[in-house]
Amino acid sequence: MAMQYDVKSVHMSASGVAVGYRTRLKGVLMSPSESQTLNVAFCDNISVSGTYDVPGSTVCTVTIANHGLSNGDRVYLNFTSGSSSDNTFTVSNVATSTFTVAVASATTNGNVTMYADILVELDCSSTTAFYTMIPGEGILAEQGIYVGLPSATVTTTLFYG
């Protein structure tokens, strides 16, 4: 196999679309600046929108029609209104148009965008930067790559091509 010369990189310091077209995720450099446990999600850039409600508890009910999830699935939720914090969550209590996730205790509701196709989820818990190489040809991202950064205390550089 010949050397691949078309690998590119992009640096992300906030959640958003890193690459807006079909590509392969080749590697990730994580650079946390604080010692706290964070989950960073690298998702296929396919999202669906819905609403959420946290009625004074730690249970967040998300309503998205025909979401296609099962109990135990992992999703990245971007809360676009209200006061819940964006993060990666484990899905439970799945019904046709609803599911729940565990969140910090709150009373809030609003709109949410869900990324259900997580390509890679990386955890960091110290201030030591680290690189994760994706073996083989990388992971195919059919619609591009969305990066979910749950805090401003971690940045990332993606390598793709």
Across the structure, where does each feature detected by a protein language model lie?
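Surface-exposed, low-hydrophobicity beta-strand/loop segments enriched in small/polar/acidic residues
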Residues: 1-49, 74, 90-95, 102, ...
